[in-house]
Amino acid sequence: MNKFKNIAVYGGGSFGTSLAALAAQNCSNVTLFLRDEEIAKEILHKKTNIKYLGGIKLPAHLHATTNLSVIKDFELIIIAVPSYAFDDSIKLLKTHGISEDNTLLIATKGFARNPTELFSDRLKTLLPHSSTAFFAGPNLAKELAKNLPASASIASLDIDIANKIANNISSKIFTTNMTSDIVTLQVAGALKNIFAIKSGIDLASEQGENARATLIVDALKEIITLSKVFGGLQKNSDILLEAGVVGDLVLTCYALGSRNTNFGYELGISSDKKKFLQEYKQLVEGREALKLVLDLIKQYDLHMPIISEVASYVMPA
């Protein structure tokens, strides 16, 4: 079976740490690269990341370090940083020697900025000729870290790369599907967080479960609309039914463990929404992506009513 011999994960937050734990289930040489020296020592010696994952025990052989000088030696590098940090992260890794010899798996959701584009397209500028794939699925970080059942989609224009990555992370309890439609998977990964805000708002206003289910249907239509702008869904629409699109969408919209759904719910029940928005300091990827998507709607004259409605709550005039 064709596999990567070693795997690096860049990003020591909840999702990055859980992806490192997932990778370590099938690979004996996995290293988590992060900035916080104290958390790195904690993972090394106690096999926990209390700040982000509570007391969940991580695999015994998982390594952690802040020393980026060795990251270039890893065949597969998983990028798990917030969307706003993507460009700076790739530029930093380039100064430490990563090149087209490394395969990059993007686990960051959202859009690259200035200009607004897909992360896979930004990588063509920042790191030309690199092998690139994208990861998405219904994956709450704490459940991944506990090695509970889950699934994901892996997309790459080179389907052999997607298959090779799948060989490293698939198991009886973590299933994967592969696709060459890297566009649709990225668009869905960015938009689902905005739709989750709407789901939380609907929950707060007691719209009922029928409305929340209808939201999923309408959200898929808007994913299709924007995906086609970027050249997605050229061959068929099968990817819409996979873990990385409808699976991730349903989880993000229905789980109060989702930061975006919880943000929408708290906004919905707030008596002073303007004050709430001003004082809310936690990172909400849907909020970050919203302005970028609104610019795309204007640029391409798109009809995406859910996005527009969320904007009326989150970015009131």
Curated annotation (Swiss-Prot):
Example of a GO MF term: NAD binding
Reactions listed under catalytic activity: sn-glycerol 3-phosphate + NAD(+) = dihydroxyacetone phosphate + NADH + H(+); sn-glycerol 3-phosphate + NADP(+) = dihydroxyacetone phosphate + NADPH + H(+)
Binding-site list for NADPH: S14, F15, R35, K109, A141, R259, L283, E285
Pathway participation: Membrane lipid metabolism; glycerophospholipid metabolism
EC number(s) per entry: 1.1.1.94
Cross-referenced InterPro entries: 6-PGluconate_DH-like_C_sf, 6PGD_dom2, G3P_DH_NAD-dep, G3P_DH_NAD-dep_C, G3P_DH_NAD-dep_N, NAD(P)-bd_dom_sf
Biological-process GO terms, alphabetical: carbohydrate metabolic process; glycerol-3-phosphate biosynthetic process; glycerol-3-phosphate catabolic process; glycerophospholipid metabolic process; phospholipid biosynthetic process
Alphabetical keyword list: Cytoplasm, Lipid biosynthesis, Lipid metabolism, NAD, NADP, Nucleotide-binding, Oxidoreductase, Phospholipid biosynthesis, Phospholipid metabolism
GO cellular component: cytosol
Location(s), subcellular: Cytoplasm
Catalytic center residues: K192 (proton acceptor)
PANTHER family: GLYCEROL-3-PHOSPHATE DEHYDROGENASE (PTHR11728), GLYCEROL-3-PHOSPHATE DEHYDROGENASE [NAD(+)] 2, CHLOROPLASTIC (PTHR11728:SF1)
Family: Belongs to the NAD-dependent glycerol-3-phosphate dehydrogenase family.
Function: Catalyzes the reduction of the glycolytic intermediate dihydroxyacetone phosphate (DHAP) to sn-glycerol 3-phosphate (G3P), the key precursor for phospholipid synthesis.
Descriptive protein name: Glycerol-3-phosphate dehydrogenase [NAD(P)+]
Record gene name: gpsA
